[in-house]
A protein has these predicted regions:
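Short polar catalytic/cofactor-binding loops
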Residues: 10-17
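Active-site catalytic loop in hydrolytic enzyme cores
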Residues: 63, 92-172
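Generic enzyme active-site microenvironment
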Residues: 8, 41, 153
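Short, acidic/polar
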Residues: 19-30, 156-165
Length: 173
């Protein structure tokens, strides 16, 4: 693997979902302009972290992989800028809901989905009210800039996450 420039982004999300997506896009553009090739956005960046409460109205925020406007928008952005974007979103798949991540390659191709395996349930983290445990297994993707693997948030506390990704040949976690 050659040299890879990675950028991370973070911003305060509001219930103005279009504004959140615009902010995320602007941060991706800024990072790409500074030479970043792999740009990470925060978990569930389209909305505030709604899992602090139990309210099933939030289920309406979920989007299916094949029709997700978020994924389409940011895959097109990845292509325009020639960058790789791991994209966290609230996924609806059939009758199940997941905290998921899709990777948009530098040519705009969506390479597939990873669904968060370890779902926390504690004060301020009511994720089991919204998300099923992932059913994809840990994923590694061949991208324009190397083999990347990803866990989502709580997954990091479990050593098998990194071990499984490394055994699959991930060069970057």
């Amino acid at each position: 693997m050659s040299k890879l420039t990675v950028a991370t982004t973070q911003f305060a999300c509001s219930w103005d979902l279009n504004n959140n997506l615009d902010q995320a896009e602007q941060l991706v553009r800024e990072a790409a302009a500074k030479g970043a090739q792999l740009i990470l956005l925060q978990e569930l960046f389209a909305t505030p972290y709604f899992c602090i409460e139990q309210d099933h109205k939030h289920l309406a925020l979920a989007e299916e992989y094949s029709s997700s406007s978020l994924l389409k928008r940011f895959a097109a952005l990845a292509k325009e800028l020639g960058v790789v974007l791991p994209l966290s979103w609230f996924e609806k798949a059939g009758n199940a809901y997941f905290n998921s991540l899709a990777v948009a390659d530098a040519d705009g191709t969506l390479l597939g989905v990873y669904r968060k395996t370890h779902i926390p349930n504690a004060i301020g983290y009511q994720e089991k009210e919204y998300f099923s445990p992932g059913d994809t297994g840990f994923k590694v993707w061949d991208t324009a800039f190397g083999r990347i693997g990803a866990g989502i948030c709580w997954d990091q506390w479990f050593p098998e996450t990194a071990r499984c990704l490394a055994l699959q040949g991930a060069e970057v976690l």
